[in-house]
Amino acid sequence: MTDYYEPTFLFRQNAIKRFSPSLSPISSVESLSLVDSNSISNNGTTTTTTTTTSSIYQNASNSSWLLNPYNVKDTAILNQSCCLNRTNVKSNYWKIPDESMNLTSMSINKNQGGNPILAISSGKSESNLFIYELNLFNNHLIHHHTISLPNIHAMKWINNTRYLVTGNNKGYAHLVSTPKLATHDVFNTNSNGDFDYNDDDEDDNNSAEICKRFNHRKHLKQNQLENTISTPIKHLNFLNNHENLLSIYNDYLFYWDIKGCHQQTRPSPISISTVSGIKNFDVPEKNHSSTNTSSANTVAICGLFGVSLFDLRDCQFNIPNYNTAQIHDKTQSSYRKLSANIVKWNPMNTNILAAGHGDGVIRLWDIRKQDSYIAELYGHNNYSITTSMEWNNNDLFTGSKDGNIIHWDLSNISKDSQWEENDNTKLPISCGLKEGFNSIEFNGKANKLETKLDQYQCGTILPASNSSIVAMCSTTTTTSSNDHDDEEIKILSIDSSSFLGVHNKVSESINVNINTNKLYYTEEDIQLLLQSQLNNNNITSSSATGSNDTLISFGNNVSQDSLVKPLTISRKPTTTIKNNNNNTTTRPTNTHTHSASIDESIVSVHNVSNDTLVNSPTRFNICESEDEFTFNYVKNNTNNEDQRQSDNRNSSFSSVSSQQTQLNNSVESLSTVVTDVENEVNHQEHKYMSLLLPVKDTSTTTTTTKDNNTNSDQAVTNTPIISI
């Protein structure tokens, strides 16, 4: 009998078999523990010391059906299903001050020559437009402005300018001039001279202003407004190098001339197209590597009708006839499979576009094969609506209402011959996740994982939020490594909990092997530590050049508030002399002239690092007033007259010191008063001061003095500098 309770075996076979090559298929559970214990005892002492970890695991419990965490084949299923192998995904989050938690849209301005500028909007009626500057290298989010522009539901920046277009829930789109930023000259000026509005008034540059208003409801007939439900402006975007504006209001697609709008008091649209059930559109980006030579007036639209191409010159739209093999009936699943709520062109190949459909599946379409899609991406929860998509070369990032962002690596799929062949009889390519329960195909007989032959595993899931992903955008940063520059993509997301997330290095996970029995550093570990320490020293020495000019130049990409670095006050070294009467005299360590200040305190200015503040080697000496001084006189065998003179001097210094001490207490000063009064002491006390040797400011030294009454040496120790 055991000393503790053991549950009975409820199952004849384990749900996940424990891997053991020495166990035959017909062996019992008891034989498994016997084999393991015999193998350890027969191998002697050497085997016992080398297998300490496994023996600890076996002695922890007699229930040998438990999985061995130190056996790779035992944990392969759990690691892949629970995404335990992912170690190189980093996310940073900031809370957006929106009490209603109703964030609606996000737009990023690349801001060539500076940090990207981020605009986040809310559906509130006031204080609902937030302008931020994002420092991607130090992961700093700097708030610049908060603007009241009620009920924003869509917006878009005009790149390299401080103008953006917003759309609200009442059918108005506004061209808004945002205030200038104090630290970015490139963002404050127009790049190519376009949209050159009057910027001579400094007061106007420091406030937001609505430059133009685009009224959508005004240009619709009264019967059209009565028969439709009023909805906000769903989506807007620029085309033709920011010369034209496209916007969706209700079931209408508006086409505006944004370049010539300043010549019109009330701008009118170029065309209005009726597209029943339209939800989104996308404009192909101009790229020299693109293989499509179609007109720039062609846009991709999606909605209840599915995915279609729209020619702005024709302004007519008819629902296409889908007679595909995949959609052959009118069931609910087929309807969801047909409808789409978001579409995005591939900037590297404008023949390819991605669409998020109502059944939660991302489908890739080739405009040269209009009868069917070419690939399906399964990763989000069933019927979870895809809210945003971003391309990065051949990588696709999708965000959904399930709170997940999935990175799809389509580099291998794009090399597949099916992408270029015009044979419509081939089935679409199926893509799944690398990790998660859906990625597991377990062979019970062989006790190992198997790869699905009919599916590419190219999706990496990132649990970005516990709520819905509202919007998403991307930006790139350039990092120098060796002799070339690498571009690293950053994915920005906002969710329904009013959090802004920045996710980087979303790539294939790295397999990190950690040896728990490792006791000593290897030669490679020492070299890595030395190299890391050398890099940190180089960064610290280069950033701490020790002048206010360097401090300002370091803060070129930050706001004025962040230029104020935190200060620390250090303790000045002092000396103490002890005698036989247990009296202590505080002596100064430095000698100064009468014109010099008596007191000095060292103020250290810290440089900003990514996560923590470290002490800078550069220190600035700031002279303080001569009032801070305390002096406790040591009684000795002298005449009364000399003692009275010394007491008078001591009282005069003490009175001045008390006033300054009260001032220091009010500001909670941490500096130690150090003064030099050698020239003020009477020549009769010179025999005491001659025993005190000068001490350096920044080092801890010890001097020896001899008392008059005894011949024993007394140690005089300087207190080292202590940073608070």
Curated annotation (Swiss-Prot):
Start-end of Polar residues biased regions: 714-724
Q: WD repeat boundaries?
A: 98-142, 147-186, 228-266, 334-375, 379-418
Disordered: region residues: 569-596, 638-667, 699-724
Query: What are the protein's UniProt keywords?
Result: Cell cycle, Cell division, Cell wall biogenesis/degradation, Repeat, WD repeat
Cell cycle in keyword set: yes
Against InterPro entries, the record matches this protein to:
WD40/YVTN_repeat-like_dom_sf, WD40_repeat_CS, WD40_repeat_dom_sf, WD40_rpt, WD_repeat_RBAP46/RBAP48/MSI1
| Record carries keyword Cell cycle | yes
- Give an example GO molecular function: snoRNA binding
What spans are recorded as compositionally biased (Low complexity)?
571-594, 648-662, 699-713
Q: What would be one Pfam family of this protein?
A: WD40
Q: Give a Gene Ontology cellular component term annotated to this protein.
A: Pwp2p-containing subcomplex of 90S preribosome
> What does the entry give for GO biological process?
cell adhesion; cell adhesion involved in single-species biofilm formation; cell division; cell wall organization; filamentous growth; filamentous growth of a population of unicellular organisms; maturation of SSU-rRNA; single-species biofilm formation on inanimate substrate
- Record family assignment: Belongs to the WD repeat DSE1 family.
Which function does this protein serve?
Answer: Involved in cell wall metabolism and required for the separation of the mother and daughter cells.
Q: What is this protein called?
A: Protein DSE1
The record lists the organism as: Candida albicans (strain SC5314 / ATCC MYA-2876)
Q: Which gene encodes it?
A: DSE1
